[in-house]
Amino acid sequence: MRGRMALKKSGIICELREVLLRKKPEAMILISPKGTVPILQLKDESVLDESLHIMRWALNIRDPDNWLEKIDESEALIVELDQVFKKDLDRYKYFVRYPEHPQVYYRVLGEKFLVMLEERLIKNHGKGLSNTRTTFSDIAVFPFVRQYAFVDKTWFDQTPYSFLKIWLTQHIESELFLSVMHKVPPWKLGDEILFVGITPDC
């Protein structure tokens, strides 16, 4: 979703093809044999197959809200997200696949990242992770915090991370996020073309 949000914000119009990962279309594998999502094929037929790369590509073309400001200061946070927290999140969500520890063990590992986010938000008066407004790091991070929170929403709601909970709610309820969350049927050859990025200034 973070890649799609950046495309929407930048106003770059792309053809949207929703896929079921358990039934990957041949056209997808031909474009990117890695077989993971998201995938963005550019006009020159080069391929971006990491959401962060898609975000940077789109925002380097058009960045109406200056999300890329202080991007260098966000690198450590994003590395921690992608290399540590996402692994902890995966184990927390799918703990039955990792029976060497109970689910709460993986929750505690992921909670360390929440503590760091809360500290950043306190520093920025609750407005953002890297600035006193929404920037690249907020959009890159919040979809994964959302996933973590909804594994056990009752537990998350009683945590002491008040700034984090408000920040997360604001992003979940934002017009931009809601605009890219609508469900579309899985793509198949011959389908009517759907687009993302038509409205540039959400």
Tell me what each language-model feature is:
Residues 105-113, 159-173:
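Extended, well-ordered alpha-helical scaffold segments
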Residues 1-115, 123-127, 198:
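GST-like domain detector, emphasizing the conserved glutathione-binding G-site
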Residues 184-202:
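Acidic/histidine-enriched, glycine/proline-rich intrinsically disordered or flexible terminal extensions
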Residues 100-105, 153-159:
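Acidic, serine/threonine/proline-rich low-complexity intrinsically disordered regions
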Residues 68-73, 178-188:
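Short, flexible loop/turn segments with low-complexity composition
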Residues 119-131, 176-181:
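Surface-exposed helix-capping loop/turn segments at secondary-structure junctions
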Residues 116-121, 148-151:
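Alpha-helical transmembrane segments in multipass membrane proteins, preferentially the mid-helix core
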Residues 129-154, 160:
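GST superfamily/GST-like fold recognition
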